[in-house]
Swiss-Prot record:
GO terms for biological process: L-histidine catabolic process to glutamate and formamide; L-histidine catabolic process to glutamate and formate. This is Imidazolonepropionase. Pathway: Amino-acid degradation; L-histidine degradation into L-glutamate; N-formimidoyl-L-glutamate from L-histidine: step 3/3. Binds 1 zinc or iron ion per subunit. The gene is hutI. 4-imidazolone-5-propanoate binds at R84, Y147, H180, Q248, S325. GO terms for molecular function: imidazolonepropionase activity; iron ion binding; zinc ion binding. Catalyzes the hydrolytic cleavage of the carbon-nitrogen bond in imidazolone-5-propanoate to yield N-formimidoyl-L-glutamate. It is the third step in the universal histidine degradation pathway. It is found in: Cytoplasm. The lineage of its organism: Bacteria, Pseudomonadati, Pseudomonadota, Gammaproteobacteria, Alteromonadales. It catalyses: 4-imidazolone-5-propanoate + H2O = N-formimidoyl-L-glutamate. InterPro entries: Amidohydro-rel (IPR006680), HutI (IPR005920), Metal-dep_hydrolase_composite (IPR011059), Metal_Hydrolase (IPR032466).
């Protein structure tokens, strides 16, 4: 028994999601009737349940509820102004996402609204969106910029993202997504905008320390592989991690390019050819699937799940919460969509929002319940962990801890 723990949770069933404990018969890494000890914000030890515990240790009796790692939403765009409900109506009338973007809608319409928004306005709306994720047991959220596309607004977005931590007990991981769309002022010279991203904004992001990763949108309506490679080289120069939106609408070999630069993740990948999957596996890059966008855009091309499984590529799931293609502020719903729309198992879906989502963000101490890991945990009143993927808007965690602190 650990006498020096800050607190313990006794009589608890645990889905550790540890890769070393997972088997074909037990993909959740289950420890039943256990006692977990927390010290200094970390998981200190997991032992069999205790009949008696020291009176000096603060103890929670879980009554055989289930303890799971805190959920991780590893791909969001939740800092923005305005909405795109009109574009949703246009799509329902037959116009495609690409056609709307070519007419100046899409990302550019959100850019116009976001540039006009104040810091306070952006912060208040972002807190509301993040709070909806948090109430479902999300303890870490990645948030991208990309709706400013100028120096001042991009920096403001990243600062807003980080400042959410002052209002909600949640870990925020800001990502600089300058190469999201070509802004109007550069529409005649997209290469000059890429230079602006690499030579003017990225150094300031580093100087202010408000992002640890860089993302790009490699697509025919956004940036070419050549342009994305320039962003990647600049990111490597500044010591930033790489993530990439690739193969969402077409196959430009963006995933192969990202893997060449050892990207943390390649996201969307509906049009990823199975023959390109080995390159992702070799670079240990996570495949982040975004069924919310697939659903909202009524796409039909599914990610190559069979090939990803065959080559043991880690698969994550994320909300892609954004105003245009995935206005979905529910990671639990995304888990269900991953199963129903993409054919994932409930265990794969849970791995996708815990262990694999942590890997997609380069967070080696999150996403699993194991000694030495951050004490990001949720207690659920369920019969089995597969219930998280089973229903829609039915359950919420009864208790949540972030870095050992209870919400």
């Amino acid at each position: 028994m650990n006498q020096n723990a800050d607190f313990c949770i006794n009589n608890v069933n645990i889905a550790t999601m540890r890769s070393t404990k997972q088997t074909e018969n037990d993909p959740y890494g289950i420890r039943e009737n256990a006692c977990i000890f927390i010290k200094n914000g970390l998981i200190d030890a997991i032992e069999p349940a205790k009949r008696r515990l020291s009176s000096t240790i603060k103890t929670f009796d879980a009554q055989r509820k289930w303890l799971l790692p805190g959920l991780i939403d590893c791909h969001t765009h939740l800092v923005f102004a305005g909405n795109r409900a009109l574009e949703f109506e246009m799509r329902q009338q037959g116009m495609s996402y690409a056609q709307i973007a070519q007419r100046g809608g899409g990302i550019r319409s959100t850019v116009n609204a976001t540039r006009l928004a104040s810091y306070e306005g952006l912060l208040n709306s972002a807190i509301g969106r993040a709070a909806r994720l948090v109430e479902e047991g999300v303890t870490t959220i990645e948030i991208k910029s990309g709706y400013g596309l100028d120096l001042a607004t991009e920096l403001r977005m990243l600062q807003v993202a980080k400042d959410i931590e002052s209002y909600l007990l949640v870990n925020i991981q800001p990502t600089y997504l300058g190469a999201h769309s070509v802004p109007f002022e550069f529409h005649e010279d997209p290469d000059a905008y890429v230079d602006f991203v690499c030579e003017h904004v990225m150094p300031e992001v580093i100087k202010q320390g408000i992002a640890t990763s860089v993302d790009v949108f490699c697509e025919s309506i956004a940036f070419s592989p050549v342009q994305c490679e320039k962003v990647f080289r600049s990111a490597k120069h500044y010591g930033l991690n790489i993530k990439a939106h690739v193969e969402q609408l077409s196959d430009l070999k963006g995933a192969r390019l990202a893997a060449k630069f050892n990207a943390l993740s390649v996201d969307h990948i509906e049009y990823l050819p199975p023959d390109d999957v080995p390159a992702i596996a070799k670079s240990n890059t996570v495949a982040v699937l975004l069924p919310g966008a697939f659903y909202h855009l009524r796409e039909t091309q599914r990610p190559p799940l069979t090939a990803l499984r065959r080559h043991h590529v880690p698969i994550a799931l994320a909300s892609d919460l954004n105003p245009g293609s995935s206005p979905v502020a529910s990671l639990l719903t995304i888990m269900n969509m991953g199963c129903i729309l993409f054919g994932m198992t409930p265990a794969e879906a849970l791995s996708g929002v815990t262990r694999n989502a942590a890997q997609a963000l380069g967070l080696a101490q999150k996403g699993q319940i194991s000694s030495g890991f951050d004490a990001d945990m949720c207690l659920w009143d369920i019969q089995h962990p597969n219930e998280l993927s089973y229903g829609i808007n039915q359950i919420r965690p009864t208790r949540v801890w972030v870095n050992g602190k209870e919400r």
